């Protein structure tokens, strides 16, 4: 399930970028802690939030909605509400992945195995989804593009996710 949610998050991000800006997607993607706090407190008693944490969470959510309000109204800056809603869904999928790991025995799996599983599921499902959608595949690589992909793979998709999985295994998710 964690691998499917992980793949779905990235599929959602791809679709989102066709309907809103990368900066708006980033903000909505990082609503993941909201979803974790809302859902994990129901499933794991040790993850309960104190009243002041709930107040802070609500204030942060209202601030995000206020900052991005022009995309929610007709005639707003490009009317990006569809993309914003999908971005919120991508954030929810990331949150659900975290909840799935933290609230199950998956939290005992080593970070590198968890990352491998999630990437393996994505590596199979996302190209199949791309083919099913009739996406054109262009392979024009430059040295810069190759180096950029290598940096993103090693740092963005390996080191950062290993650290995240390690943190989930050692600390309450609502405290990270």
Predicted segments with their positions:
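Hydrophobic alpha-helical transmembrane segments of multi-pass membrane transport proteins
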Residues: 1-19, 38-39, 65-66, 85-100, ...
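Hydrophobic transmembrane alpha-helices of multi-pass small-molecule transport proteins
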Residues: 31, 38-39, 51-71, 124
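Short alpha-helical transmembrane interface motifs in multi-pass membrane proteins
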Residues: 24, 52-56, 81-86, 144-149
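Cytoplasmic-side transmembrane-helix entry/capping segments in multi-pass membrane proteins
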Residues: 1, 48-61, 83-84, 108-118
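Hydrophobic/aromatic residues within transmembrane alpha-helices
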Residues: 16, 42-45, 49, 104, ...
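Short helix-capping/hinge motifs at transmembrane helix termini and TM-loop junctions
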Residues: 44-45, 67-74, 105, 133-137
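Membrane-helix interface residues
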Residues: 20, 46-49, 108-109, 170-172
